[in-house]
From Swiss-Prot:
Chief location of this protein within or outside the cell: nucleus
C2H2-type Zn finger ranges: 122-144, 150-172, 178-200, 206-228, 234-256, 262-284, 290-312, 318-340
Gene (UniProt): ZNF124
Naturally occurring in which organism (per UniProt): Homo sapiens
Keyword Metal-binding belongs to the record: yes
Family according to the record: Belongs to the krueppel C2H2-type zinc-finger protein family.
SUPFAM superfamilies: beta-beta-alpha zinc fingers, KRAB domain (Kruppel-associated box)
Keywords assigned by UniProt, alphabetized: DNA-binding, Metal-binding, Nucleus, Repeat, Transcription, Transcription regulation, Zinc, Zinc-finger
Subcellular compartments: Nucleus
PROSITE patterns: KRAB (PS50805), ZINC_FINGER_C2H2_1 (PS00028), ZINC_FINGER_C2H2_2 (PS50157)
Protein name per UniProt: Zinc finger protein 124
Length: 351
């Protein structure tokens, strides 16, 4: 039988032939994404077989589904946490139908069945990842094709995986089952809770391989790495300017529209970016939290401190590509470039 999904003959396969279970030891080795993929594969396999009315010799699909995990529970009932064979009655979790060989691992029996039947592996031609069963292969392909077969009945949003739809539904129901034991704040996703818990522990597990800087969240590391690679995937459709993160592009688009959605409550001045408003608000309270270690001078924002520190170090990182002259500040380089272009953007209004 070929490795193409279309060649899998569903009516010749019982659920227990394709149901892949794990011992406790094997399950512990899987990461969360692999466990989620496993659940999706088993659910979809069950639905596919049930939809065509496929039955085993003496059992219904439902019975086969229950019995595939019952064997493993039987062992554990005698041996406690021991995921291996039962010492009291000698029963093992599963048996290969082709050669009657028993095994402590359901996955090993599944591989043995594949060997007997000649059902080959299902290889992804895009990323070369290999799968043993077609439903697992089909679900994986959605990562490449962008197929989204699961639609939310509430808002119509489509998602690629059933677990993603289940998570999305909590937005509508307001369900927040994951609660922080430290402060009581609740979240709709376990991953959001884990991220939040780091604000209490101070843990920063994501480290940049280029400079060693550590981050609390993986997406922050991802954005930071672009400062090293120069990658700017977000492009303005109006002027072609590119940005390393989506929020920067969104702020830039507001500049074209003339939108300034962040007003200062103290004086009413409006800004395009929340960060610009935060810097401005410090001018009202005369706060200068960024202090130079060399001379003690204080600054309202970290970028001003960095510019100032170069007066001590003599560093000039901004170089003109035209003549090679270097400057300590980006704004000074920008002004210098106009000497080459002849640009004179400032006109006297009285003329």
């Amino acid at each position: 039988m070929s490795g193409h999904p279309g060649s899998w003959e569903m009516n010749s396969v019982a659920f227990e032939d394709v149901a892949v279970n794990f011992t406790q030891e094997e399950w512990a080795l899987l990461d969360p994404s692999q466990k989620n993929l496993y659940r999706d594969v088993m659910q979809e396999t069950f639905r596919n077989l049930a939809s065509i009315g496929n039955k085993g010799e003496d059992q219904s699909i439902e019975d086969q589904y229950k019995n595939s995990s019952r064997n493993l529970r039987h062992i554990i009932s005698h041996s406690g946490n021991n995921p291996y064979g039962c010492e009291e009655c000698g029963k093992k979790p599963c048996t290969c139908k082709q050669c009657q060989k028993t095994s402590l691992s359901v996955t090993r029996v599944h591989r043995d069945t594949v060997m007997h039947t000649g059902n080959g592996h299902y290889g992804c031609t895009i990323c070369e990842k290999v799968f043993n069963i077609p439903s697992s292969f089909q679900i994986h392909q959605r990562n490449h094709t962008g197929e989204k077969p699961y639609e939310c009945m509430e808002c119509g949003k489509a998602l690629g995986f059933s677990r993603s739809l289940n998570r999305h539904k909590r937005i509508h129901t307001g369900e927040k089952r994951y609660e922080c034991k430290q402060c009581g704040k609740a979240f709709s996703r376990s991953s959001h809770l884990r991220d939040h818990e780091r604000t209490h522990t101070g843990e920063k597990p994501y480290e940049c391989k280029h400079c060693g800087k550590a981050f609390r969240y993986s997406n922050c590391l991802h954005y930071h790495e672009r400062t090293h690679t120069g990658e700017k995937p977000y492009v303005c459709m109006e002027c072609g300017k590119a940005f390393s993160c989506l929020s920067s592009l969104q702020g830039h688009i507001k500049a074209h529209a003339g939108e300034e959605p962040y007003p200062c409550k103290q004086c009413g001045k409006a800004f395009r970016y929340a960060s610009s408003l935060q810097k401005h608000e410090k001018t009202h309270i005369a706060q200068k939290p960024y202090v130079c270690n060399n001379c003690g001078k204080g600054f309202r924002c970290s970028s001003s401190l960095r510019d100032h520190e170069r007066t001590h170090t003599g560093e000039k990182p901004y170089e003109c590509q035209k003549c090679g002259k270097a400057f300590s500040r980006a704004s000074t380089l920008w002004k210098h470039k106009k000497t080459h272009t002849g640009e004179k953007p400032y006109k006297c209004k009285k003329m």
